[in-house]
């Protein structure tokens, strides 16, 4: 069993973006390829949770397993994706990553996983005053909490955090690198993110 594993969430419909965000161009590759390059440099095992519509093109791009949600919970948002990844890879801790934050650095995973300890269920960053539960790490024991929520048809990450002993991290090394956590949800944000990158 790995101590640490990674789960990339690429199951959303990307309705605001207008096309699958996982396949959007970024620095000569795609969002999903860039994120996986960063994650696999730090983590022993990584799995991509994909929407069925893009599973095949994603598989052609990446060298890690690409799976869909557990059938019974398909379409139940990020909780379904996270628990599907937890079932696929056995690990103590799971670093979660959405497919629409392409600016992430391998340094982030070193910081995040360095904050894990057995007394916590989750480690979650606070960026510009906002909790970021999809850029976080979760202990294996959280799996049962997720199943319980899904059985009650609850899908909220906030509801999950309310049931966990969470270590929130908001130190200078996180705040000074807020651009690591930028989510690209619209074409306007995509254009701005590319401009910001070219200005660095």
Curated annotation (Swiss-Prot):
Sum up the protein's function in the record's words: Transfers a GMP moiety from GTP to Mo-molybdopterin (Mo-MPT) cofactor (Moco or molybdenum cofactor) to form Mo-molybdopterin guanine dinucleotide (Mo-MGD) cofactor.
Q: Name one GO biological process term.
A: Mo-molybdopterin cofactor biosynthetic process
Q: Does the keyword GTP-binding apply?
A: yes
**Keyword annotations of the record:** Cytoplasm, GTP-binding, Magnesium, Metal-binding, Molybdenum cofactor biosynthesis, Nucleotide-binding, Transferase
According to the record, the segments passing through the membrane are none
Residues recorded as binding Mg(2+), renumbered to this chain, are: 100
Protein name as catalogued: Probable molybdenum cofactor guanylyltransferase
- Origin organism of this chain? Bacillus cereus (strain ZK / E33L)
Spell out the reaction equation it catalyses: Mo-molybdopterin + GTP + H(+) = Mo-molybdopterin guanine dinucleotide + diphosphate
Notes on the domains: The N-terminal domain determines nucleotide recognition and specific binding, while the C-terminal domain determines the specific binding to the target protein.
Gene3D superfamilies on file? Spore Coat Polysaccharide Biosynthesis Protein SpsA, Chain A
State the compartments where it is located. Answer: Cytoplasm
GTP-binding listed as a keyword: yes
* Record family assignment: Belongs to the MobA family.
Q: What is its EC number?
A: 2.7.7.77
Which cofactors are required for activity?
Mg(2+)
- Tree of life domain: Bacteria
Its taxonomic placement starts with: Bacteria, Bacillati, Bacillota, Bacilli, Bacillales
Q: Where does GTP bind?
A: 9-11, 21, 69, 100
Q: Indicate the principal place this protein occupies in or around the cell.
A: cytoplasm
> An example Gene Ontology cellular component term from the record?
cytoplasm
Alphabetically, the GO molecular function entries are: GTP binding; metal ion binding; molybdenum cofactor guanylyltransferase activity
């Amino acid at each position: 069993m790995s101590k640490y594993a990674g789960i990339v969430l690429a199951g959303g419909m990307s309705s605001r973006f207008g096309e699958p965000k996982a396949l959007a161009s970024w620095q000569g590759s795609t969002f999903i390829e860039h994120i996986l390059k960063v994650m696999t440099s730090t983590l022993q095992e990584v799995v991509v949770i994909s929407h069925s519509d893009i599973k095949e093109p994603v598989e052609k791009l990446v060298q890690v397993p690409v799976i869909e949600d557990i059938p019974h919970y398909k379409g139940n948002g990020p909780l379904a994706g996270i628990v599907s990844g937890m079932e696929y890879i056995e690990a103590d801790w799971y670093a979660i990553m959405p497919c629409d934050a392409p600016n992430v650095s391998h340094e982030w995973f070193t910081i995040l996983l360095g904050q894990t300890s057995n007394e916590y269920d989750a480690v979650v960053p606070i960026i510009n005053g906002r909790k970021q539960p999809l850029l976080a790490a979760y202990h294996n024991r959280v799996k049962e909490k997720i199943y319980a929520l899904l059985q009650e048809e609850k899908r909220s990450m906030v509801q999950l955090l309310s049931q966990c002993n969470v270590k929130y991290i908001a130190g200078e090394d996180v705040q000074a690198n807020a651009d690591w956590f930028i989510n690209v949800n619209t074409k306007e944000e995509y254009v701005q993110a590319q401009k910001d990158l070219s200005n660095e």
